[in-house]
Amino acid sequence: MKRILFTLAICLIAAISYGQGNKGSKFIDFTVKYDGKEQKLSDYVGNGKYMLVDFWASWCQPCRAEIPGLIKIYNKYKGENFGVLGVALNDKPESSKKLIETMGIPYPQILNAGNQVAYLYNIKGIPEIMLFDPSGKLIARGLRGPYIEIAVKKALEAQDSQKK
């Protein structure tokens, strides 16, 4: 009997966590406190524009490799109902700030996000780059390299065709 209950509990936990951060799901809000301030994901996502969210860390070489491309995408599309947000996971805020300054990252950042954020979005590795629609629905995740801009361009074009 205990084995059956244990198995059912594991299945229930798996079922609940399956929906976390999956394509088509609404964003899961979180709050991060740092330097006397609170920042929420909802300060950026679900506010009427497409948001590309990069979960990263300064010590992560693949994260660093994606940043120049993200900066180009941000600069290219920032006037088109689009924005980029960085969320530094499991990183010392001082290290995050140093990298932001060194690389000249122009888009906003949420610093000092910990494991709870990775858990909320079922993030297994970084960088984890996600695209949310204007209502805050997750429309793409696991974006890397040229596929980031392809997803952004496709979303913005779909939005433009709906306006016509």
What function would you assign to each model-found segment?
Residues 1-22:
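Bacterial Sec-dependent N-terminal signal peptides
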Residues 29-50:
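A short beta-strand-turn-helix
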Residues 48-51, 55-59, 125:
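Short pre-active-site segment immediately N-terminal to redox-active cysteine/selenocysteine motifs
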Residues 52-54, 86, 130:
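Hydrophobic beta-strand core positions in alpha/beta domains
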Residues 55-72:
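Conserved redox-active cysteine motifs that mediate thiol-disulfide chemistry
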Residues 80-95, 105-114:
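Thiol-based oxidoreductase modules, predominantly thioredoxin-like and allied folds used
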Residues 99-105, 112-156:
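Thiol/disulfide oxidoreductase modules built on the thioredoxin-like
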Residues 160-164:
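Non-globular targeting/processing and membrane-anchoring segments
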